[in-house]
Amino acid sequence: MELIVGIIIAVCIFMSFKTVVKACFQKNFLSYETVIMITYLYISLLVGFGMIYLICIQSNMEVLIEAGNPISGGYFDKLVTALYFSAVTLFSVGYGDLAPIGLGRFLAVIEALIGYVLPAVFLARTVIGIENSN
């Protein structure tokens, strides 16, 4: 069941990317709608990766450790921890209170890479759009 939910989450993340990429190539890139779409993309990435971490944690896979110990607590505690780690990773803050291990390292690298690349892509696209309008 967790695999099916994970696949659905991956498809949703891909569809979010597809929608934003499509919006990037419209005539007026820097608009209110585009900013809202970028915000939704970041939120969907944050929640999507958070759910992937949570699925792994709930499946007794050790993907995150806190102070050298696996994540413990109830479902809500694990959910909050997974979303927090996803946000800290996506926005490249990295406080150091949580650390990925095993598969979590691979997931964290993918999420951090996306977090680094997205602002550069949007900035470059905005500059190109401004130059083309002049």
What are these regions (language model features)?
Residues 1-11, 75-80:
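Alpha-helical transmembrane segments of integral membrane proteins, especially early/N-terminal helices
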Residues 5-23:
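N-terminal signal-anchor/start-transfer transmembrane helix
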Residues 7, 11, 38-47, 113, ...:
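Alpha-helical transmembrane spans of integral membrane proteins, capturing the lipid-embedded, hydrophobic core
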Residues 13-18, 45-49, 53, 119-124:
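Alpha-helical transmembrane segments of polytopic integral membrane proteins
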Residues 23-24, 55-63, 129-134:
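Membrane-interface elements of multi-pass transporters and channels
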Residues 27-43:
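Alpha-helical transmembrane segments and their helix-start/interface "positive-inside/aromatic belt" motifs
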Residues 40, 44-82:
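Outer-pore turret/helix-boundary of cation channels
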Residues 81, 85-134:
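Pore domain of cation channels
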